[in-house]
A protein has these predicted regions:
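Extended catalytic cores of very large enzyme megasubunits
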Residues: 1-957, 964
Length: 964
């Protein structure tokens, strides 16, 4: 146990209890943690999808680190927009310190205000950060998590700092829901949620929406082969999903219990099959935005490979996308033929009846062409009938491939991530060119009840099914794969059942009907770029505090069903993770695709998970282990020992119960301080568990950190690499700033480059930003063409605001008078936003391109002056950089980075393996197989351009016309 000391060496004051001692590392006793920050003001507009103004928040005050995108996202997504009482009063509770008491509306004083001013929204970061940290502290204090009041105060201050400094952040549902009741007395009507009273262990029904918030982002829910009636029925699942989506959470289910197409029903007849039910759930999810108005519903659909409908399921999303393609083609074709027929009718100037095809030969040709191109006869007749009634034109809504458009809205299967569960037995059959059996669900049930082997309904070559998985993933990025055997070999609580599914992003994998609340730590904030050293003690401290926070969140939470409430209470799973690993590696001067990078990733993951379990053991010593610990103790301690063995890079024979040997930490490639901390964390985690057990069945995952990554201003999410060497930063006052990826100069200095060399390399990437020295556009050359000093000054002043040299020479920059009087441009030229002034003054396309590269940069480090060949890999990104870049990180490195982290993660890793458009189906297949052989639990692949909704330029429409 830690000693109770404050920052600066001052001892805490207060009575000694049984809870935890909280160290101060970032704050000082008696000082407001927010006084450490510079605060800025910004106005934030929230717009609807059509661009109309939905809401405006004026004078938002946030720490300066939240300028630009981070502040805009936080204000748009997480500030409470309404219902906050303008005047509050404290609610006294026995044993709760005044500073920690919850608040409620002071209705008497509110009456003195104008009605429209009585309830407002949040506009200050202090309100938001205190709402979160105060709620966690309040619940933790009431239930004995702190040894003394001084420890509770230290925890509150430290958590305020961790969030306000962008060192870490909880998942979105915490921001949406946590603290609305504690800070403002907001209640809201009850929605049917349930919770376990932490004092009595009794199941309770929530009396309002927010007293017990819904802070969990990730849910796994069971579903039975029953249409209605039970809590786990098919229709019951859609209801529970709606409750989760409403409060900003996501959910996943394994649907393998549902009968396949053609299986007999108890009441007679046969089943319509799995897909018919999945379509209903897909529609329901598509109609709901998570958190009310904040984001789309998040959903995972999983199916075992032995389900009789597995082939239809694998094809489902691709088949539906092909329907979208048909709708796009058909709607445009229909409009084209309607226009041609109407034009033939109304442009007819011959003798006879314009509607008689014997008289109007052009109409006959247009109608025949339409029918030949599969326009239904009934539509052609409709065109003629409308023309007879005087219609001159007909308008059809043209579909497009926008994923938010009507085309995608018409089809199913687009509101979920789809995955298949792959057991080792399938991989063995695949390796041995064997067959794979599919089973009716009723047969599996009957065989189990009768103690016999089930009879397959169909058999097929394993390779045939695997090829189908690879092809559809190549074509539309789904399905992903989850390796069932590996997942269950690392299961801490098998006495509670098998792990069947995951949350939408595949990082939370545990028992059905459980939930996980997430938080992520921004790794880059713990790296001192000047000293080139990672602050291990501060990272360990943050892990400890966040483990406590997520555990307290389980304590205070409500859930959408009785079963989830009870099992979440019994197992208390947590999801602590990190982001910005890719950025950290570049700052350290280490290539992403490098054994050193894998060692650093493994060590940091090991420290996080080991420290988190050590804290969980500490909590168990104070509060007791999770209720289902003792019946799973042997299993869990076995898993803990395997984690520890990976930290020590043990031999494969030393692991207990594993089919595949995990990737341990390579001691020769890992910094010694990280390696020592990684080993020490697991020494303490295993020892603490052996003595006290654990408070939580799981503690860590690697989540995608999408929105909260933006709030933390993280360059990279989860374990992803850098995406680009040039970044675009939105400014608080409007506009966009083009900046160098901050990892580039840091890495160059780390690699020993001098300041002058760093400047030259950065100029190569970003450009010089000035005309002087540029080919064909040096001021001396331009002055010969009549450019004045004033105009040249205007051009250079515009460069920070434009991204291309042509834009810097537009008439709006040069001035209409100069353009017309000196450059002999016409009024029409000046008003044409596409007019190429540089071509007008005699520069060739090659000249313009060369000048653009010098002034605005190549966007890539390739070819940079003075850069050593062996250092190129440090700056490789997920995709080639700039117009001329050719290098990018191979997909194998993505898989290996996941494999480096996975042995030290309780759950799994949410990550997409990025592949170029040129990737083959074999590449997809090999990525899945490498993921399995390196002991990853899941793998999702995205080939650039594989989604119909992604713009993919093959050639321009003009080029297409030229080819016609």
């Amino acid at each position: 146990m830690q000693t109770r000391t404050e920052k600066g060496g001052k001892n805490s004051e207060g009575p000694i209890g049984t809870g935890l001692v909280i160290e101060r590392r970032f704050t000082t006793i008696g000082e407001d943690p927010f006084d450490q920050f510079d605060w800025i003001e910004m106005d934030v507009e929230i717009r609807n999808a059509d661009g109309s103004l939905a809401h405006r928040i004026d004078d938002v005050r946030l720490p300066s680190g939240f300028s630009g995108v981070a502040g805009k996202v936080l204000a748009q997504k997480y500030l409470r927009k309404a219902g906050v009482p303008a005047i509050l009063r404290k609610v006294k509770e026995k044993g709760v310190p005044t500073w920690l008491q919850r608040s409620e509306p002071d209705h008497e004083k509110l009456q003195s205000l104008d009605p429209e001013k009585r309830f407002i929204g949040e506009s200050h970061g202090r309100e938001l950060f205190r709402r979160l940290a105060g709620t966690w502290t309040y619940w933790g204090w009431k239930h004995g998590y702190f040894e003394a009041e001084a420890d509770a105060r230290a925890y509150f201050d430290e958590m305020c700092y961790l969030i306000a400094s962008q060192r870490s952040a909880p998942n979105s549902p915490q921001w949406f829901n946590t603290g609305l009741h504690w800070a403002y007395g907001i209640e809201g009507p009850a929605q049917g949620h349930r919770y376990i009273d932490p004092s009595t262990g009794e199941l309770m029904t929530s009396t309002n929406a927010y007293e017990h918030p819904q802070p969990h982002a990730c849910f796994i829910q069971s579903v039975s082969d029953s249409l209605v009636g039970g809590t786990d029925s098919i229709m019951g699942l859609w209801n529970r999903e709606a409750l989760l989506f409403k409060y900003g959470s996501g959910t996943g289910s394994n649907f393998s219990n549902i009968r396949g197409s053609g299986e007999p029903l108890s009441g007679g007849g046969t089943s319509s099959g799995l897909i018919s039910f999945l379509k209903i759930g897909d529609r329901a999810a598509g109609a709901i935005k998570s958190g009310g108005t904040t984001r789309r519903a998040a959903k995972m659909v999983t199916l075992d490979l032995d389900h009789p409908d597995i082939e239809e399921y694998i094809d489902w999303k691709l088949s539906e996308e092909e329907k979208v393609s048909a709708l796009v083609i058909g709607s445009n074709l229909l409009q084209s033929h309607a226009d041609a027929i109407m034009d033939a009718i109304w442009s007819f100037d011959g003798e006879g009846d314009r509607l008689d095809m014997n008289d109007n030969r052009e109409l006959k040709k247009a109608a025949a062409k339409a029918i030949k191109n599969h326009v239904p006869n009934s539509h052609v007749k409709r065109f003629l009938d409308l023309a007879e009634q005087g219609w001159k034109s007909i308008h059809f809504d043209k579909m497009d491939t926008d994923w938010q458009g009507e085309g995608y809205g018409t089809v199913s299967g687009q509101n979920s991530n789809n995955s298949v569960r792959v057991p080792n037995s399938f991989m063995d059959a695949l390796e041995n060119n064997g067959t794979w059996n599919l089973y009716h669900r009723t047969e599996l049930k009957n065989a189990s009840e009768n103690g016999r082997e089930p009879e397959p309904c169909r058999s097929m070559p394993a390779k045939e099914l695997w090829d189908k998985v690879a092809y559809t993933a190549w074509a539309c990025a789904d399905p992903g794969v989850q390796f069932d055997t590996t997942i269950n070999e690392w299961h801490t609580c098998p006495e509670g059942g098998r792990i069947n599914g995951s949350n939408p992003c595949s990082e939370y994998m545990f028992l059905d009907d459980t939930a996980c609340n997430l938080a992520s730590i921004n790794l880059l904030h713990y790296f001192d770029t000047d000293a080139q050293k990672f602050d291990i003690p501060s990272f360990q401290h943050s892990v400890r505090l966040w483990t406590m926070t997520l555990e307290i969140s389980v304590l205070m939470a409500q859930f959408p069903s009785e079963e989830i409430a009870r099992k979440s209470y019994e197992y208390r799973t947590l999801g602590l993770g990190y982001c910005n690993l890719g950025s950290l590696l570049m700052h350290m001067g280490i290539p992403y695709a490098d054994d050193r990078a894998y060692a650093v990733c493994g060590a940091l993951s090991s420290i996080m998970c080991g420290e988190s379990y050590a804290t969980s053991a500490e909590l168990a010593g104070s509060l007791g282990p999770f209720p289902k610990y003792h019946e799973n103790a042997d299993h869990m301690l076995k898993v803990m020992r395997n984690h520890k063995r990976a930290a020590y890079d043990a031999k494969g024979s030393e692991y207990e119960g594993l089919t595949i040997t995990p990737m341990g930490i390579d001691a020769k490639r890992c910094p010694s301080d990280l390696l020592d901390a990684a080993k020490s964390a697991w020494d303490r985690a295993v020892h603490g568990g052996e003595e006290y057990g654990y408070r939580n069945a799981q503690t860590t995952v690697i989540a995608p950190t999408g929105t909260i990554g933006l709030v933390m201003a993280a360059d990279t999410t989860g374990v992803e690499p850098q995406f680009s060497l040039v970044q675009y930063k939105q400014l608080a006052g409007g506009g966009t700033l083009r900046i160098i990826n901050r990892g580039v100069p840091s890495a160059l200095k780390r690699l020993g480059y001098k300041d002058s060399e760093v400047t030259a390399i950065v100029d190569h990437i970003m450009g010089t930003g000035r005309l002087s020295g540029s080919p064909g556009l040096d001021p001396s050359v331009l002055k010969e063409k009549g450019f004045t000093d004033e105009v040249l000054s205007n051009i250079e002043s515009s460069m920070p605001d434009v991204f291309d040299i042509r834009s810097a020479f537009s008439p709006s920059v040069l001035g209409d008078d100069f353009c017309k009087s000196v450059l002999a441009m016409t009024d029409e030229d000046c008003q044409n936003v596409f007019f190429d002034t540089l071509a007008h003054i005699g520069l060739s396309a090659e000249d313009i391109e060369r000048a653009n590269d010098v002034i605005f940069g190549y966007g890539s480090i390739e070819g940079a002056p003075g850069l050593k060949e062996e250092h190129l890999a440090v700056f490789d990104c997920a995709t080639p950089c700039g117009k001329h870049g050719t290098r990018s990180i191979d997909w194998q490195a993505h898989v290996l980075m996941m494999a480096a982290a996975q042995p030290f993660i309780s759950g799994a890793i949410s990550k997409t393996i990025n592949m170029p458009a040129s990737a083959s189906i074999d590449d997809i297949r090999e990525a899945y197989e490498l993921s399995h052989s390196t002991m990853n639990k899941a793998c999702a692949v995205y080939r650039d351009g594989s989604k119909l909704s992604q713009p993919c330029l093959l050639y321009t429409s003009d080029a297409a016309d030229d080819q016609a």
